[in-house]
Regions:
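Hydrophobic residues at beta-strand termini and immediately following loops
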Residues: 5, 105, 214-216
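Conserved C-terminal guanine-recognition region of P-loop GTPase G domains, centered on the G4
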Residues: 146-154, 159-210
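A short, charged, Gly/Pro-tolerant segment at domain boundaries
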Residues: 241-260
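Nucleotide-state-sensitive switch-loop elements of NTP-binding domains
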Residues: 14-41, 45-54, 59, 63, ...
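Canonical P-loop GTPase G-domain recognition
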Residues: 189-244
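Long, basic/Gly/Ser/Thr-rich N-terminal segments
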Residues: 1-16
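G-domain G4 guanine-recognition motif of GTPases
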Residues: 56-57, 82, 86, 140, ...
Length: 260
């Protein structure tokens, strides 16, 4: 974990009698929440849906966004992606080669994106927010720390590759509990790897009962058209994000109006 994550800190020693303790992790999260709220107002004023895409490394986030960008391009819709990685801009260059407006963020040793990083990346977007149809924040590959940090998104999306197994929601409950939408990716490989769909759905229902679930495949394109329709025209009106925070118990609130 990185030095800025609350989960990286050792338990503090007992405080002397009569003293006050300021938990730096809490202060960091509070500052991030304030910056995220400002971003959310900015996105709402632009009428722009924004996704925070979270997954394990290698789950297929970038490949999925390449195909989603192609699908949107056929409809004359504009997609932009802010790409978070510890090092290199390889994924951003992949997306740019596919015709997607992409801005990289290299976090160094930080295992997640923060609202301030996103705000700085917005200044490097070649198009104003008002001219975009969808903005995706591709978070650093990690199912732990990103769950704690609000980025001003209107929807939080967790991608679970079928190659990772059915038990990921049980092992990493905070990320899945925080999701408005869970994507079962690489769905064309489910039979090959013996993915138990019913068991995965049961785990998701236990951990993330308010999340919508969609199956997609970047390789075959299956589910992408339906996914795009859902993102741009959800069945229920999205409510304003209710951020209750990810404090202590490792759980956070979601926009319940985004259920499918």
């Amino acid at each position: 974990m990185c030095a800025t994550c609350p989960c990286a800190a050792d338990p503090p020693p007992a405080a002397p009698a009569g003293s006050r303790r300021l938990t730096l992790g809490q202060a960091l999260l509070q500052r991030n929440d304030q910056q995220a709220a400002a971003l959310r107002r900015r996105f709402q004023q632009a009428g722009l849906p924004v996704l925070n895409l979270i997954s394990s490394p290698g789950s297929g986030k970038t490949a999925l966004l390449e195909r989603l960008g192609a699908e949107m391009g056929q409809r004359n819709l504009r997609l932009a992606v802010i790409v978070g990685d510890l090092a290199t801009d390889r994924d951003a260059r992949r997306l740019a080669a596919a015709g997607v407006e992409a801005v990289p963020i290299s976090t160094g040793q930080a295992c997640h994106l923060e609202a301030a990083m996103v705000a700085r990346a917005l200044e490097r977007l070649p198009l104003p927010l008002e001219r975009l149809d969808l903005l995706v924040i591709e978070n650093v590959g990690n199912l732990v720390c990103p769950a704690a940090f609000d980025l001003g998104e209107s929807l939080r999306v967790v991608l679970l590759s079928v190659c990772e197994g059915e038990d990921k929601p049980l092992k990493y409950p905070a990320s899945f509990h925080s999701a408005d939408l869970v994507l079962l990716g690489k769905s064309d490989l489910a039979g090959v790897v013996g993915f138990d769909r019913a068991q995965a759905l049961a785990h998701l229902e236990a951990v993330a009962p308010g999340a919508a679930v969609r199956e997609v495949s970047a390789r075959s394109g299956a589910g992408l058209e339906a996914l795009l329709e859902w993102l741009l025209h959800p069945r229920e009106p999205r409510q304003e994000w209710e951020w209750r925070g990810w404090r202590g118990a490792g759980m956070r609130g979601t926009a319940k109006g985004a259920e499918g």
